[in-house]
C-alpha cells in the first residue's frame, strides 16, 4: 500500500498528480465509503461497504442497498422524510 501522510490522508496515494482541488473531492468520497454507518436494524455503527451500492452490517449481518459511496443518498433522505411526513398527516 502506498504511503500516506497526516495532512492529505487517504489521497496520499496519488502523490502530486491530478491537482489539489480534485484530490480534495476524491478524499471526501473515499473517506465516506470507508467509514462505518449506523445500522437501522440493530442500532450499531457496523454498516460497511461490500461493493458498489451494497452495504452489510457486521453486527446483525443484514445487507442493505444504498448509495455507491455513502449509505444514504440525497434522494433517499428526501423520500424518507416525505414518507414520514405523510404518515404523520394521515394519523392525525
Curated annotation (Swiss-Prot):
Q: Where are the zinc fingers (C4-type)?
A: 39-60
Q: Which GO terms describe its biological process?
A: translation
* Sequence similarity: Belongs to the eukaryotic ribosomal protein eL43 family.
What's the protein name? Large ribosomal subunit protein eL43
Source domain of life is: Eukaryota
User: Entry's InterPro entries?
Assistant: Ribosomal_eL37/eL43, Ribosomal_eL43, Ribosomal_protein_eL43, Ribosomal_zn-bd
Which GO molecular-function terms appear in the entry? structural constituent of ribosome; zinc ion binding
Could you list this entry's UniProt keywords, alphabetically sorted.
Metal-binding, Ribonucleoprotein, Ribosomal protein, Zinc, Zinc-finger
Any one cellular-component term (Gene Ontology): ribonucleoprotein complex
Q: Which HAMAP family match?
A: Ribosomal_eL43
Q: Does the keyword Zinc apply?
A: yes
Amino acid at each position: 500500500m502506498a504511503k500516506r501522510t497526516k495532512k492529505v490522508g487517504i489521497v496520499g496515494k496519488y502523490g502530486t498528480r491530478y491537482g489539489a482541488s480534485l484530490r480534495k473531492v476524491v478524499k471526501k468520497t473515499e473517506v465516506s465509503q470507508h467509514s462505518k454507518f449506523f445500522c437501522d436494524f440493530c442500532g450499531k455503527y457496523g454498516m460497511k461497504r461490500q461493493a458498489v451500492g451494497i452495504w452489510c452490517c457486521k453486527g446483525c449481518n443484514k445487507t442493505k442497498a444504498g448509495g455507491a459511496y455513502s449509505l444514504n443518498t440525497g434522494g433517499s433522505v428526501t423520500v424518507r422524510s416525505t414518507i414520514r411526513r405523510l404518515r404523520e398527516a394521515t394519523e392525525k
